[in-house]
Amino acid sequence: MTKLSRRELGRLAAGLMAARAARLEAQPPAPSEYVGPLTGVEKGLEDRRFDPVAYTLDLYAAAPRRLGFQARTRSEAEAWQQQLRSKLTELVGGFPVEHLPLRPMTLETRTFRGYRREKIVFDSRPGVSVLAYLLLPEQARTPSATLICVPGHGRGVDDIVGIDEHGADRTDKAGYQHDFAIQAAEAGMAAVAIEPMAFGCRRDAITARKGLSTSACQPAAGGALLVGQTMIGWRVWDVMRTLDYIATRAELDSSRVGCMGISGGGTVTLFSTALDTRIRAAFVSGYLNTFRDSVGSLSHCIDNYVPGILNWAEMYDVAGLIAPRPLFVESGERDDIFPIRASIESFTRTREIYSVLGVQDRVEQEVFPGEHSFWGKRGLPFLARHLNA
């Protein structure tokens, strides 16, 4: 037998370790099996249940949904909309009676290829201010059709207006939101991209120190619940105040305003358009689903929840409040937090409401070959068509 030198043994050992590491890297980690206080003592517990989501789904099945859509005529549907819109306003915590002066201010104006971008602030309610970017296309006829653009979870509004994590300009439309406010401007529509409360620069000081993508939704949305309100209601009010701001700008046509958003921004878009009829059309990306299959079954941010809503309505009922105004929905077939089957189900139920109102041609869905991300291939032309009509 040939005796190996110490150096050769070292090389052999290193090679074996590298090969083993490569094999481990190539193999997916084995799922860890839960071991807890009930492991090994399951006998006799067959009729016991410890799963809280299963319990929630039992409650879902028993919930009355007192204002679920049942209308058969246009007049019945319109009466139903009035009832549910009033109840939904109550459920999200209501809105201020007084419209505080906006006190708008332009902080910065910059010119880019094809559009001008203004950084603006205005007041929403006492103690609450909103940051937004206004994107004005060079070639748009004025006053211009305008889109209120609401980002989903992540870095906030910068992620939809071409600003990277270092505050520098970018042109590659990176990230899951693909700078969709810029895409709106490139499609010839003005865009007012707002920073949602608890996102980006509108986070609390403690959370902001933890990094750009650290969510502040937990303390803020939790605080809203403690006073009988909701983060959804707060963000919808910001959209309503954005509509007020648009009405102050001569370049913008306040009678041709749409709203669009993805994920958490899709939540805000759906509820805002349902509750404020000044919004003429909506584009909801990566959100329309059922409460049962999304926020009722999967882990989601607390800002998605409206206490008691399932006693009155499902998500498709909320979507039905948008009718007869145009609504476009897009869903990724591999979206893992808003499952596609339930998205299609919810859209089908929404279309039934549009059908009773005689406007089934004003609601569309695109299922695209992707995950939880903005697509926009048909949605943006849909908005342009309806807002420029």
Where are these regions (language model features)?
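Non-catalytic accessory segments flanking enzyme active sites
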Residues: 57-135
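Mobile cap/lid helix-loop segments that gate and shape the active-site cleft of serine hydrolases
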Residues: 219, 223-227, 241-242, 279-320, ...
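Cap/lid segment of the alpha/beta-hydrolase catalytic domain
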Residues: 150-237, 294-296
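N-terminal secretory signal peptides and thylakoid transit peptides that target proteins
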Residues: 1-17
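Short beta-strand/loop motif that positions the catalytic acidic residue
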Residues: 329-331
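Alpha/beta-hydrolase fold nucleophile elbow
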Residues: 252-261
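C-terminal catalytic histidine-bearing segment of alpha/beta-hydrolase fold enzymes
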Residues: 348-349, 353-389
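Proline/glycine-enriched tight loop/beta-turn segments at coil->beta junctions
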Residues: 127-128, 138-146
